């Protein structure tokens, strides 16, 4: 089925109303049950993935600033951390928007707020008036979570216009279930839009991205010229398959909220065990306690072990600084034990090889 258009509006193409209702219910589950939106106070659609969702969000906010505040492109800037998904570089290039990378601490992966404070002052002095910020609910490499409260407090202290899109491509189907104090949702008035990938934690077919935004903002990108389409089209992609929406709806209903929570908690238990064991071996790593990503400092683990267990490097160009473990359902206890045994053996060999030098000293 072709799910072209935006089905959160009353009028849409009548040919596939049955499957469109499933997409609407999928949006309801995600917006209302997971991200705490007020019923019927949001728009959204099932996109091709996180890249399209990020593009859709920044496009909407660019047009919002132009339509509502008469902004010019060079008065708008996009801010995101250096750990943010690479799609933002594409987005800014295509939309012809300037951007600034926000520095993060090497160990904590937290945005450096002192530098951000200085940057905001510099940008305002240079004539930048309108800010679009992409914050992360689970970065690709680290699973790190940006501090939305501190960032928005800083923005308000500078008295600037800002819109915030939450890139929850990875974390959106785990973090809200594992962290009862999650503030990345529509109860937070500073959150304007959220996107989450179904093909990551839910293992829905590629590519499945779910884009959600507060009601009415998406009107800024209505394509008036699509007059031959029954209904309204506000989407970047236009025609799109309804199959992914149907599959994701079925997966969520198969699990149920309790089943999905139990599933994610099992991944956290395994991640906790890996981290506890690595700490006992004096292996340095980064992990957010509510996420299933464990990222190990490269100097504490040899490449041969990383490649044996298909850990993901932060770069394929030169020497990686970090190696990533993503704890999914296939990561069973036997695999975890084998990995930790290999790391233990490596650490023991390293200590043994150091002993002769230590004796000389």
PLM segments and residue spans:
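Glycine- and acidic
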Residues: 6-15, 39-45, 75, 99-104, ...
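Conserved N-terminal alpha-helix of the aminotransferase class I/II PLP-enzyme fold
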Residues: 6-52, 64, 68
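Phosphate-/polyanion-interacting regions in eukaryotic proteins
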Residues: 1-3
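Secondary-structure capping and boundary motifs in well-ordered enzyme cores
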Residues: 18, 46-53, 80, 84, ...
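Conserved C-terminal alpha-helix-loop-beta "cap" of PLP-dependent enzymes
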Residues: 74, 89, 223-237, 258-361
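Short glycine/serine- and small hydrophobic-enriched flexible loop segments
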Residues: 32, 59-63, 249-254
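Active-site C-terminal subdomain of aminotransferase-like
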Residues: 177-180, 184-288
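Conserved PLP-enzyme active-site core in the AAT-like
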Residues: 48-222, 360-361
